[in-house]
Amino acid sequence: MNRLQQRQLFLENLLVGVNSTFHQMQKHSINTCCRSLQRILDHLILLQTIHSPVFRLDRMQLRQMQTLACLWIHQHNHDLQVMSDAIKWISP
């Protein structure tokens, strides 16, 4: 698996994990929802970077992915095709 494929897999796992957790949450205000998503994303990123050294990415890139994941989830209601497009768009 080359680096591009590894990065694609990392992003896919990140977004799918966030999406899955988001579905399990109760309805909240946007602010509460965003704060919850931030904690979820921090946890998922921590798990990925601790257990998969090959996936260690620059912290700024991870923060950018957090923001993009939140935006996509809020704006597109968990649409799988949109999520797939987002993964392709984020990936280099």
Swiss-Prot record:
Source domain of life: Viruses
InterPro entries xref list: Rotavirus_NSP6
Predominant subcellular localization, coarse grouping: host cell
Provenance organism: Rotavirus A (isolate RVA/Monkey/South Africa/SA11-H96/1958/G3P5B[2]) (RV-A)
Protein name, entry field: Non-structural protein 6
Keyword NAD on entry: no
Assigned GO CC terms: host cell mitochondrion
Keywords: Host cytoplasm, Host mitochondrion
Cell inner membrane listed as a keyword: no
Family per record: Belongs to the rotavirus A NSP6 family.
